[in-house]
Regions:
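Contiguous, glycine/small-aliphatic-enriched amphipathic segments in soluble metabolic enzymes
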Residues: 1-119, 123, 127-135, 143-145, ...
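A short mid-domain helix/strand-loop element embedded in enzyme catalytic domains
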Residues: 139
């Protein structure tokens, strides 16, 4: 079985974060399902290895090109000095079928401008034909998405497509949290398109009563603070961003928390699972069944057996 090549961008990582990355990737369970390619830690890898207590030899392979990556090894690539250069290089490698996934490991100081810049950077490099990119935040089993009143309906449509592809949900259910009651009609009209969207709900009641549990995703319409409240409510120690609507799977670890091995492993497994879901979806919908009737034929013809057939 071909192993997926996972590009990890770690240019902004400090020494302790690099140590965590190497320790997590050295796990045999990770190396059996993917081939990690890490950029940004080539200058500190020797000192990091000296600090790690090694019971067995860590399989490190230093490379200068993605195509030289070896399965069963932690491939440290020495080619890019900044985060933006690494992302461009990884995206270019994806276009050449040499990288399957990208995971961005930002610095400890991270904000929405960084996330917007990441999406813009990828859009500049990719010719995107998979729809509008949406930046999700995932914590545990809860998916959240920030939106505005102007783009709410379009974002719900894009989110519906994204969860069908990436989460194999046939009819994903969406809850909209917001104060604009006039959007109720627009949300209800989506159900005529067989999109299961409901709301808008009042934020305090929705979160306090845990009304989010039956839904597959929650969209916060101009309710940034309420979104943060919900994420804090369901926090299980691993919160990360995931960008849908791109031809490749891109995840971004939340830089506001200290990186742990379990967090990195969860994001890697999530990315691989999402990639496999996309492959299954495209395989199932690539060649739809053709109609089994002749458009110009008549289905109201009646055979009269009392008449003789003229030759």
């Amino acid at each position: 079985m071909k192993l997926l090549k996972v590009g990890l961008v770690a240019n902004a990582a400090n020494g302790s974060t690099c140590e965590t990355i190497i320790s997590a990737l050295a796990n045999q369970d990770i190396l059996e399902v993917c081939t990690p390619i890490v950029s940004g830690i080539q200058d500190s890898i020797d000192s990091v290895l000296a600090n790690i207590e090694q019971e067995v030899q860590i399989p490190i392979c230093k490379i200068s090109r993605v195509e030289d990556a070896l399965d069963g090894k932690i491939n440290i690539i020495d080619c890019c000095n900044t985060e933006s250069e690494s992302i461009r290089y990884m995206v270019s490698s994806f276009l050449n079928n040499m990288v399957d996934l990208i995971i961005d490991l930002p610095s400890e100081i991270c904000n929405s401008k960084d996330e917007t810049a990441l999406i813009s950077l990828i859009n500049e490099t990719l010719s995107n034909e998979d729809g509008k990119p949406l930046n999700w935040t995932i914590s545990g089993n809860v998916r959240t998405l920030l939106t505005t009143g102007d783009t709410l309906v379009d974002d719900i449509r894009e989110a519906h497509i994204a969860l069908r592809k990436d989460a194999t949900l046939i009819k994903p259910r969406f809850a909209v949290v917001g104060k604009d009651d006039t959007s109720h009609g627009n949300i209800a009209s989506l159900r005529e398109e067989k999109i299961m969207a409901f709301g808008p709900f009042e934020a305090d009641t929705f979160i306090n009563a845990k009304h989010y549990l039956p839904y597959d995703a929650v969209l916060f319409c101009d309710e940034d603070s309420a979104c943060q409240r919900l994420l804090a409510e369901v926090d299980e120690g691993c919160s990360f961003e995931y960008i849908s609507g791109l031809p490749l799977v891109v995840t971004r670890l939340n830089g506001k928390a200290d990186l742990t091995q379990s967090m990195l492993k969860e994001v890697i497994y999530f990315s691989i699972h999402t990639h496999r879901n996309r492959v299954r979806y495209h395989g199932a919908t690539k060649h739809p069944l053709e109609r089994q009737w002749i458009p110009r034929g008549r289905d109201d013809f009646k055979l009269d057996l009392t008449k003789e057939v003229s030759e």
